[in-house]
């Protein structure tokens, strides 16, 4: 089995973890390929790019590392085992202490591959030419950047104008992304298996404009009508571009999902309770059942 490895270099114990993976690879029948940032730390194995043929991926870090790994998968049907070395790790498959068991289950095929809906987005310039395209597992966000002023957005769903948002920004999220930035901005929690697109305004200047849950098969179009001359579009909090008046952002469901490894007992609501304190109050998590 060819396995791609993506990791967060900021984790001080990462070299030891890479050595552990390399030492166990022969017994697991793994051939390891490391992303460019890790290859010099591993000192052996292959280099991992978007074009490297792999059968599975292991990410070593937090949710951001898993999101970066999902971009490298680039639409291929490759299960991603996320090992959490970060603070929250809501998307990851197991903790650092559970890594050995998780990797062995990956080798045996003893896991559930959970498909997660992905968004496909593109920026169209004033000449109607596509200049950028991205895939987002979490969200696509149009926001004002560093300017302390509102932006007025026009939003269309399947070509129908549904309203204008005066806000600091607009989050367009997947069900997976509903527990990320969208949740912080007051958006709803959506189960990952309920395919949909969530629109959540960031600090809207009205009480009438609330988050909106749309069917997964619609196309969302966003234009900036008024605000700073230059806005930002950010994808999964990691990549993006500038955005100016006269340009259009189009977001729709991508045809290929991302496949995240789920181990026995790791249900969505278990993670909600343990990671986000769902159903309990701060300091009283132990009372939740």
UniProtKB/Swiss-Prot annotation:
List, alphabetically, the HAMAP family matched: NAD_kinase
SUPFAM superfamilies xrefs: NAD kinase/diacylglycerol kinase-like
- Catalytic residues? 63
The EC number(s) attached to this protein equal 2.7.1.23
Q: Could you identify this protein by its name?
A: NAD kinase
- Protein's organism: Gemmatimonas aurantiaca (strain DSM 14586 / JCM 11422 / NBRC 100505 / T-27)
Q: What is its main location?
A: cytoplasm
Q: Which gene encodes it?
A: nadK
GO cellular-component terms in the record?
Answer: cytoplasm
Which reactions are catalysed by this chain? NAD(+) + ATP = ADP + NADP(+) + H(+)
């Amino acid at each position: 089995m060819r396995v791609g490895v993506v990791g967060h270099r900021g984790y001080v114990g990462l070299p030891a973890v890479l050595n552990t993976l390399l030492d166990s690879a022969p017994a697991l029948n793994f051939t390891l390929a490391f992303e460019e940032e890790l290859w010099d730390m591993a000192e052996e194995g292959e280099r991992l790019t978007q074009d490297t043929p792999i059968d599975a991926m292991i990410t070593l870090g937090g949710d951001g590392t898993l999101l970066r790994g999902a971009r490298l998968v680039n639409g291929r049907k490759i299960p991603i085992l996320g090992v959490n070395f970060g603070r929250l790790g809501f998307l990851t498959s197991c903790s650092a202490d559970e890594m050995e068991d998780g990797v062995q289950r990956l080798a045996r095929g003893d896991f559930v591959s959970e498909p997660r809906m992905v968004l496909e987005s593109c920026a169209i310039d004033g000449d109607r030419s596509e200049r950028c395209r991205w895939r987002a597992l979490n969200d696509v966000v149009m926001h004002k950047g560093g300017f302390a002023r509102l932006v007025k957005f026009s939003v269309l769903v399947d070509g129908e104008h549904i309203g204008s948002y005066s806000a600091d920004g607009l989050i367009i999220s997947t069900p997976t992304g509903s527990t990320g930035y969208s949740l912080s901005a007051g958006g709803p929690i959506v189960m990952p298996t309920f395919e949909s697109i969530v629109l959540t305004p960031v600090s809207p200047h009205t009480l009438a404009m609330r988050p909106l849950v749309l069917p997964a098969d619609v196309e969302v179009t966003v234009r900036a009508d008024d605000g700073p001359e230059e806005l930002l579009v950010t994808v999964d909090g990691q990549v993006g571009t500038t955005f100016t008046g006269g340009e259009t952002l189009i977001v729709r469901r991508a045809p290929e999902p991302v496949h995240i490894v789920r181990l026995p007992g790791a249900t969505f609501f278990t993670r909600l309770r343990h990671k986000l304190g769902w159903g309990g109050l701060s300091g009283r998590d132990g009372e939740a059942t």
